[in-house]
Amino acid sequence: MEDYFYNKIFIRVESVICMCTKHFTKIDVHPQELYYGITKIPTHISVARCISLNILHNYYGMSYKTLSDRSNMTDKSVMKCVAKAREYIHTDKLYQDIYNLAISKLYGKS
């Protein structure tokens, strides 16, 4: 039963993040693209991936292990991605804009 709810949460967050990323970058991002590629992935996909993992970890309390299983990444890579988003949300305009729009769409607040 827990997997069912986690899957619903993953689908909702990933689709909202992709929509918000498209809004600011004008490039289509699809949820199935978020976890493809290991190196040299395009910026818009990297931003969407990091922000979605950050929200799933910090707002929904999902463990790094759960996130790594979903994303086919190592636990360490997921940790780095979450930390990167946590820092860039406060320092990078693109991350800020996408994050703030996503939070307002998901939770109705800024």
Tell me the role of every PLM-derived stretch.
Residues I89-S110:
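Short Lys/Arg-enriched helix C-cap and helix-to-coil transition segments
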Residues T21-R49, M73:
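Short, Lys/Arg-enriched anionic-surface-contact patches
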Residues H57, V82-A83, I89:
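DNA major-groove recognition helix of helix-turn-helix
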Residues M1-H23:
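General nucleic-acid-binding
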Residues S46-M62:
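Short, amphipathic alpha-helical "recognition" segments used to contact nucleic acids or chromatin
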Residues K65-R70, T74:
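Short alpha-helical "recognition helix" segments of helix-turn-helix
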Residues T39-T43, H57, S68:
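Short, charged/polar micro-motifs that form catalytic or ligand-binding hotspots
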